[in-house]
Amino acid sequence: MSKESIYGLTMAQLTDWLMERGHKKFRATQVWDWLYRKRVTTFAEMTNVNKDCLQLLEDHFAIETMSEHVRQESKDGTIKFLFRLQDGNLIETVLMRHKYGFSVCVTTQVGCNIGCSFCASGLLTKNRDLSSGEIVEQIMKVQFHLDQVGKEERVSHVVVMGIGEPFDNFQNTVDFLEIIKDHKGLAIGARHITVSTSGLAHKIYEFADLKLQVNLAVSLHAPNNELRSRIMKINKAFPIEKLMDSINYYIEKTNRRVTYEYILIKDVNDHKEEALQLAELIGDKRHLSYVNLIPYNPVDEHSQYQRSEPEAISQFFDTLKKKGINCGVRLEHGTDIDAACGQLRSKQEKKKVKVN
């Protein structure tokens, strides 16, 4: 039977777990330090923790529950990791290098059921949720890589934008955020963390009430219901009116800016008309809104969709700017590897099917 990842415990949970079994509170602090500051990969390396405590941890938990299966490195320094989980499933994690530090994009589910018509992640439907420990371990695996190559750098930013819908795995995602923010551990600043949702409106309300101080991004991709329902089936459950109500609640509750992700697809959602509709949709919340324009990464299985022409991207950007909307065109990473989210995993799963 597979052991639970120790990375899945918050500091409070680890403390309670050890104290319930007769150990002093300071033991949890020691273990936490070994895990996240000294970054050991075995319990035996925790030299100042007594043998009884180490044996208890060894009997119940694992530090490593996934292994590197494939790694792709881009000329721009982006690295895409494909990790194999204990049950044989594969997940993607991406390391991106920026002027301001190292950012990691994590996955929250094995597959995705949101079913956006342009996305590689949904080519393989959801198998299961990841545990909070499996999400944290993605960060640790990337940090181990940075340690090994001697960069003397740390993961400074996290985006929860990999395969899956984070708000469909809500509690594990929230626990993950608490663990990586802990100031005695990885100490990743809340304002350096962004969680992206396809628009589960009821969970946006819940997320707002938690006041976590992390950034929220919403995958919008269309400014009206007719178009959004056509390319994102989630819109049928949470149409734009409901989605915007939840976003407005989030803004009022947190006074934090919301980022709207908008993938530009040629002749689908990249016209001036859509840019004007988007500006109108954001309306008087423009001071706490930012539109992230993303040139589409073509996917073989969705050949009906193509990247917008540079002229269309410029026109869309200029139209938003003239309407007073804060926006930018996302700097691309890993264009010479399987850049689209879910692309590498999908290719590897197809290879497994052919072999079998």
Swiss-Prot record:
Return the broad EC class.
Answer: transferase
Cysteine disulfide partners in this protein: 105-341
Catalyses: adenosine(2503) in 23S rRNA + 2 reduced [2Fe-2S]-[ferredoxin] + 2 S-adenosyl-L-methionine = 2-methyladenosine(2503) in 23S rRNA + 5'-deoxyadenosine + L-methionine + 2 oxidized [2Fe-2S]-[ferredoxin] + S-adenosyl-L-homocysteine; adenosine(37) in tRNA + 2 reduced [2Fe-2S]-[ferredoxin] + 2 S-adenosyl-L-methionine = 2-methyladenosine(37) in tRNA + 5'-deoxyadenosine + L-methionine + 2 oxidized [2Fe-2S]-[ferredoxin] + S-adenosyl-L-homocysteine
The family classification in the record reads: Belongs to the radical SAM superfamily. RlmN family.
Under CDD domains, the record lists: Radical_SAM (cd01335)
Q: Locate the coiled-coil region(s) and give their ranges.
A: none
- Statement: the UniProt record of this protein carries the keyword 4Fe-4S: yes
Q: Where are the transmembrane segments?
A: none
Task: Cite the binding residues for [4Fe-4S] cluster.
Answer: 112, 116, 119
State the EC number(s): 2.1.1.192
The Gene Ontology biological process terms listed for this entry are: rRNA base methylation; tRNA methylation
On cofactor binding, the record's note says:
Binds 1 [4Fe-4S] cluster. The cluster is coordinated with 3 cysteines and an exchangeable S-adenosyl-L-methionine.
Q: Which UniProt keywords apply?
A: 4Fe-4S, Cytoplasm, Disulfide bond, Iron, Iron-sulfur, Metal-binding, Methyltransferase, rRNA processing, S-adenosyl-L-methionine, Transferase, tRNA processing
Q: What name goes with this protein?
A: Probable dual-specificity RNA methyltransferase RlmN
Q: Do the record's keywords include Glycosyltransferase?
A: no
Query: Which GO molecular function entries does the Swiss-Prot or TrEMBL record give?
Result: 4 iron, 4 sulfur cluster binding; metal ion binding; rRNA (adenine(2503)-C2-)-methyltransferase activity; rRNA binding; tRNA (adenine(37)-C2)-methyltransferase activity; tRNA binding
Q: What species was this sequence derived from?
A: Shouchella clausii (strain KSM-K16) (Alkalihalobacillus clausii)
Localization, UniProt: Cytoplasm
Q: Where is the Radical SAM core domain?
A: 98-336
Q: Which SUPFAM superfamilies match?
A: Radical SAM enzymes
Q: Catalytic site residues?
A: 92 (proton acceptor), 341 (s-methylcysteine intermediate)
Cofactor requirement? [4Fe-4S] cluster
Amino acids binding S-adenosyl-L-methionine: 164-165, 196, 219-221, 297
